[in-house]
Amino acid sequence: MSYLAVSSFSLHKALGPLRLEMRREDGTLDDLLIDFPRTLTFEEFIGQARDTVGVKAVELCQLQFDSAVPERIEHLRAALDEAGMRMLTMPIDIGDLGHVNAAWRADDEARIKNWFTIAKQLGASYVRVNAGSPGSVVTQDAWAGLVASLRSLGDAANSMGLRLLVENHGGTSSSPEFLLPLQAAVGLDRLGILLDLGNFDPLVGISHARFTNTDVEDTGIDLEPMYAAIARLAPHATLIHAKSVDPARDGTPLPDLPRALSIVAASGYTGSISIEWEGRLGDPWERTCAIAATVRQQFPHLQ
């Protein structure tokens, strides 16, 4: 069964700090928090996604968890069950599997696998990791290590009844010429592709700049390569992120979501789609509902 889901990142302005990390040259890890107020709990988000958007599934992002202690996870699973909702995906944003340091990668793998256990406890179908770190460039000398790490994680996910995904998430990973050979090297049985309809240059750079309140030129840009990349990856996608951000100053939609979704539909895709509103303007629930209506026009079969 295929679902329309809402990502918790769509409510990033309300669900509290984003918890990232940075590894120093000596290997120690520092927490990196992007501060947002917590005016909504995960439990409240789940209920509102059902009642406001009319979906039956959610995506809960690891970097938005306020706690991962067993009692917290049990309470969250109970909230999902009570609401009649399922957790579709857990995007996991820790580690750098594209680093050449094997010991660091091994540590990252172990910590990622701990989140696999949490995802399984919450009933997730998919876990998404990064092919490197978001926006990074994976060098040729890091390729073998990245493939080995993803094979290990893919086997671990399979053993838990989960499906491992990587996403076009900026940098090298936003190139089909990188993602498709990577999937082939890791093995289609171990690794799927999460196609994010907005995470291609130049849009991913615009989105990240806005997120850090950096002024960036967003008018007159050529988005045709982005739609070509969507067409290249859509036949290989396991899951879709219906991404949308605030329009350009001249009103150009970023992206043209009906066009992007029509490309996906033309590829024969019939799987699940998760809504990810990444804009800063307007009411996020209203924006998410608008995206949901657009998705359902192209994919009316989604639960």
Model-found features: residue ranges?
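N-terminal pre-domain/capping segments
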Residues: 1-121, 188, 192, 209, ...
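Short acidic/histidine-rich active-site segments
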Residues: 272-280
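Aromatic/hydrophobic pocket-lining residues that form the small-molecule binding cavity
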Residues: 42, 73, 108-115, 143-146, ...
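Active-site-proximal loop/turn and secondary-structure-junction residues that shape catalytic pockets
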Residues: 10-12, 62-64, 93-96, 131-135, ...
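A short helix->loop->beta-strand "cap" motif at the edges of active sites that frequently abuts
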Residues: 85, 162, 267-271
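A structural motif
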Residues: 54-55, 119, 124, 237, ...
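Acidic/histidine-rich catalytic cores of soluble enzymes
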Residues: 18-20, 57-58, 90, 150-262
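Active-site groove signature of glycoside hydrolases
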Residues: 119-139, 160, 165-173
